[in-house]
Amino acid sequence: MRQLAIYGKGGIGKSTTTQNLTAGLVERGNKIMVVGCDPKADSTRLLLGGLAQKTVLDTLREEGEDVELDSILKTGYAGIRCVESGGPEPGVGCAGRGIITSINMLEQLGAYTDDLDFVFYDVLGDVVCGGFAMPIREGKAQEIYIVASGEMMALYAANNISKGIQKYAKSGGVRLGGIICNSRKVANEYELLDAFAKELGSQLIHFVPRSPSVTKAEINKKTVIEYDPTCEQANEYRELARKVEENDMFVIPKPMTQERLEQILMEHGLID
């Protein structure tokens, strides 16, 4: 069983990328579980046909400790198992703790069955606080992929996440598997992301182009592969799935200084 965490700044398209990637992996004959670790709880919406899934934390609040697995785990597209950890009530508590509670509960309830090939954690990545770092810190996820684009803030976040990975890689077995570019159609985007990934000592594992097919599929509450399996974008996600499945480049990243990051941005025309 490979356990992967997908990080990236808010709004970058992590959840969309993760769900489309898992749809590609399931086509390749893999059994998959997706654990949403974002308080927005939208990490499994496209796999469940838009059903707002009840989160682990909501279920715990309503039902107390006595929770059955089938009340927090729903089966979605092509048998993908879907869980949302959810978040605390606004203004109270820590969302990171929710992730810890959820993963512990899934373990106790026997969700991690031997037939699973992949478990994905879709994690909010602007803040690499202890709770959100939990999938890396506790050695749950061995592989991290960062979703980024050619925008400055996306790369700042990706560099910060790399610092978190570097910190926990020394004690645990966590490694960076690569950067996934979710294109924003910024000038020189491919070259910039490729240079950024190489500077970290990693790779740009795939460049996902921007496409109206993604929005159309989302409006229809489906992944692109389910909604329009023959379109070009569906093949992009299949290619991403192949590259992730066959990936053998796992590194402890070398995060860069602010100055070096800005230098790379300047070299590729993002800062004048």
From Swiss-Prot:
ATP binds at residues 8-15. Keywords: 4Fe-4S, ADP-ribosylation, ATP-binding, Iron, Iron-sulfur, Metal-binding, Nitrogen fixation, Nucleotide-binding, Oxidoreductase. The keyword Metal-binding applies. The reversible ADP-ribosylation of Arg-97 inactivates the nitrogenase reductase and regulates nitrogenase activity. [4Fe-4S] cluster binds at residues 94, 129. Its cofactor is [4Fe-4S] cluster. One of its GO terms (biological process) is nitrogen fixation. Gene3D superfamilies: P-loop containing nucleotide triphosphate hydrolases (3.40.50.300). Binds 1 [4Fe-4S] cluster per dimer. One of its GO terms (molecular function) is ATP binding. It comes from the Bacteria. It is an enzyme of class 1 (oxidoreductase). InterPro entries: NifH/chlL_CS, NifH/frxC, Nitrogenase_Fe_NifH, P-loop_NTPase. Belongs to the NifH/BchL/ChlL family. HAMAP family: NifH (MF_00533). The key enzymatic reactions in nitrogen fixation are catalyzed by the nitrogenase complex, which has 2 components: the iron protein and the molybdenum-iron protein. Homodimer. NCBIfam families: nifH. PANTHER family: LIGHT-INDEPENDENT PROTOCHLOROPHYLLIDE REDUCTASE IRON-SULFUR ATP-BINDING PROTEIN. This is Nitrogenase iron protein 6. It comes from Clostridium pasteurianum. The lineage of its organism: Bacteria, Bacillati, Bacillota, Clostridia, Eubacteriales.
